[in-house]
Amino acid sequence: MPGTDVWQWQTRLGSTWRGSYCFIPSVCEEDFPAQAFEGIEPARMALREGWRKLLPRAIADPLNPESWLGGRGHPMSALHLPDAPPQPGWDKPNTPHCAVQCITWDSLRLKNQRKVWIFATGDAQPEERPLAILLDGQFWAESMPVWPALQAQTDAGVLPPAVYVLIDVIDNNTRSNELPCNAQFWQALQEELLPHLRTLTRWNETPETTVVAGQSFGGLSSLYAALHWPEQFGCVLSQSGSYWWPNRGSNPQGGQLIQRLEGGLVCDKPLRIYLEAGVREPLIHQVNQRIYPLLQQTQRAVFYRQVDGGHDALCWRGGLINGLAWLWKASL
């Protein structure tokens, strides 16, 4: 506001909106390239690059008690509008739960080393517990810990007692290489990580109850894994799946996996698939709209949920719990 040290901005949102935000103080007039505003509509790719350069200077809202570190390490704060869908489990952050085991996976095939977290929500009948593999595990283990929400929904009878395996991505470069349709990553997981996990805990190894879950590249990776190894992974939880890959800017109608489905890619076994995308993430929303009917043509059970939000972990956390409940409800 002129003549003061107060910054002011306003917008209008629907009452069902949920999203995260941060403050990025700047007095620079050239934070975004000129081409971002040359057309009638802002150029989203140019805007994206401008925001990414600004994020290291972001701060959380100092008056908002609900804050965390986003996927790129910058502070975020939460905003839930009055009619945003409930997120059961996340409202009980103090729910007691058992200890989380953290191990190191030293992969010969991938030639790297990373953390893996193992968490169980019950041990009365270990061989009957389903398994869920969560990609971007470092986020759900450290930035926005998922343990209390999983335990709270298990205690409430919404989720069965289960084993959760959270896999670190190491860094953004490794993530961008390993998660998008990378057979080497999934072969290493099956040949190296799962055999080691069997020496540490037990679960029901039927594919009908084994979930692979991920967001963005992780959502793409989850569906890729199940389509190619259905004998191991029978349930998919894909949130904001990056089905544009590998051509973000030039192929809004779909990337490699969509093209393969259109070309007749058939899975040997029927899968259970839970898709979710935000209506405020245009490209992601478009490609999820495109892949949904393709999966309906070939798969046993596909559920598609559209969220009034963007490419945002604050939205994903609710869908993660809802997706697990839906996938396991008819399988157990």
Task: Enumerate the language-model features and the residues they cover.
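Non-catalytic cap/lid and distal C-terminal segments of serine-dependent acyl enzymes
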Residues: 1-332
